[in-house]
Amino acid sequence: MAHKKGVGSSRNGRDSNPKMRGVKRFGGEHVRAGNIIVRQCGTKIKPGENVGVGRDWTLYALVDGVVQFGHYSRTQKMVSVIPVTAAETAH
């Protein structure tokens, strides 16, 4: 077995592309239907009311409204969208 590394080989040089995951709309922010709220791997944050789940566990708004984060259980979080009526948005 060789005790010297062969010339011309490199063990480094690999790096994956960034996936741009994370929270995209924070609590209290207004969202339109279809806006992405969270990009995640797995159900780290659970969908609440008026929130849909994409194929890759992306959470998105189903209605126009305001984002609200809360607790799903003692250890898990949940995100909901509280609908806003047209009269409230006029102010």
From Swiss-Prot:
Q: Which UniProt keywords apply?
A: Ribonucleoprotein, Ribosomal protein
Write out the GO MF terms: structural constituent of ribosome
Q: Which SUPFAM superfamilies match?
A: Ribosomal L27 protein-like
Top-level taxon in the UniProt lineage: Bacteria
One Gene Ontology cellular component term attached to this UniProt record is: cytosolic large ribosomal subunit
Gene3D superfamilies on file: 2.40.50.100
Pfam families, A to Z: Ribosomal_L27
Q: Where is this region: Disordered?
A: 1-26
Could you identify this protein by its name? Large ribosomal subunit protein bL27
What gene does this protein come from?
rpmA
